[in-house]
């Protein structure tokens, strides 16, 4: 049984993990992790997690903007990184770590998976990021539905 978070909700299902991809690189403070599943009944579940190692001080404007909650600094991970704007100290009693941002989409149509992964530049041109492209490349080897919409695109 798989569990995928969608904000504060949890999706539980049986199926197969088709692919995973991450934008993490050495030295990254923030990155995206994608997972693509196919349920036993044929639905696709696309999961995206925005990961952050950054923490803030109480006076940082990002605390309010992101809706961050205070925690005792002693529970910070050893990998936690102070915000470059507010420069909080790890020796502070209370800090405001950025939250992981969980998002998921359930769809019966593999086209909806691609549509969710497409980005648009300022001129309106559609493209796939490298992390999305890697996710789909592996998933296409595992699933005919993804392969049929990813490898060949019909242009009207």
Would you name each region that the model predicts?
Residues 1-25:
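Negatively charged, low-complexity tracts enriched in Asp/Glu with abundant Ser/Thr
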Residues 6, 54-55:
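Alpha-helical membrane insertion/targeting regions
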Residues 16-44:
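Amphipathic, interaction-prone secondary-structure segments
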Residues 25, 52, 109-110:
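A short, sequence-level motif marking secondary-structure junctions
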Residues 30, 34, 55-57, 61:
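Acidic, serine/threonine-rich low-complexity disordered tracts
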Residues 41-43, 49-52, 58-59:
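Predominantly late transmembrane helices and immediately cytosolic-facing juxtamembrane segments
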Residues 63-90:
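Long intrinsically disordered, low-complexity regions that are acidic and Ser/Thr-rich
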Residues 81-156:
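Low-complexity intrinsically disordered segments
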């Amino acid at each position: 049984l798989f569990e995928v978070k969608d904000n504060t909700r949890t999706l539980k299902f049986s199926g197969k993990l088709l692919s995973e991809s991450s934008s993490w690189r050495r030295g990254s403070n923030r990155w995206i992790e994608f997972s693509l599943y196919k349920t036993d009944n044929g639905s696709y579940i696309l999961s995206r997690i925005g990961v952050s190692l950054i923490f803030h001080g109480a006076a940082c404007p990002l605390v309010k903007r992101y809706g961050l909650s205070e925690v005792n600094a002693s529970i910070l991970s050893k990998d936690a990184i102070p915000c470059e704007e507010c420069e909080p100290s790890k020796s502070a009693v209370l800090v405001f770590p950025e939250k992981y941002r969980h998002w998921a989409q359930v769809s019966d149509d593999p086209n909806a998976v691609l549509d969710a992964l497409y980005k648009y530049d300022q001129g309106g041109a559609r493209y796939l990021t490298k992390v999305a492209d890697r996710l789909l490349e592996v998933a296409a080897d595992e699933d005919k539905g993804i392969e049929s919409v990813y490898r060949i695109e019909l242009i009207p």
